Curated annotation (Swiss-Prot):
Family membership: Belongs to the UQCRB/QCR7 family.
Membrane topology: Peripheral membrane protein
Upper lineage: Eukaryota, Metazoa, Spiralia, Lophotrochozoa, Platyhelminthes
Protein name: Cytochrome b-c1 complex subunit 7
Cellular component annotations (GO), alphabetically ordered: mitochondrial inner membrane; respiratory chain complex III
Domain of life: Eukaryota
Native species: Fasciola hepatica (Liver fluke)
Keyword Transport: yes
An example Gene Ontology biological process: mitochondrial electron transport, ubiquinol to cytochrome c
């Protein structure tokens, strides 16, 4: 788990570096897109609103307990805010620098494992079939 947490930190720093390396126009477009999205006004991160699939469910299952609890809190708070048709105060909105892709390392590990499992599913034992 420590290596995956380190991977999340590397992904976060790489994401922030990419944001800094964008041209002025790219930064303005990204900021416009981000400020007009609704999920950041509810305090959610992008990976909190990814459509669920078996791969995403597996990645979420692999999250550390603290990260899972934080994710569940963000989703529950967003549901409550959405039901009451309100948003968070502007200072509590998710900032573009804080919207890191925290599920990426877990998704990559799950993809690799599924690919390896698929390769082994087609393995033919030479002793069984000479």
């Amino acid at each position: 788990m420590a290596t995956l947490r380190a991977s999340v930190e590397r992904v976060a720093s790489a994401y922030r570096m990419r944001l800094k390396q964008m041209t002025d126009l790219q930064q303005k477009v990204k900021a416009f897109q981000f400020s007009n999205s609704y999920y950041n006004q509810l305090g959610l991160l992008y990976h909190d609103v990814i459509p669920h699939s078996p791969l995403i469910a597996e990645a979420v299952r692999r999250l550390p307990r603290e990260e899972t609890e934080a994710r569940d809190f963000r989703i529950a708070r967003a549901f409550q805010l959405s039901a009451s048709k309100t948003v968070l105060p502007k200072e509590q909105w998710t900032a573009i620098e804080d919207d890191i892709p925290y599920l990426d390392p877990y998704i990559e590990v799950a993809k690799k494992e599924w690919k390896e499992k698929a390769e082994w599913d087609h393995f033919v034992n030479p002793e069984t079939y000479p």
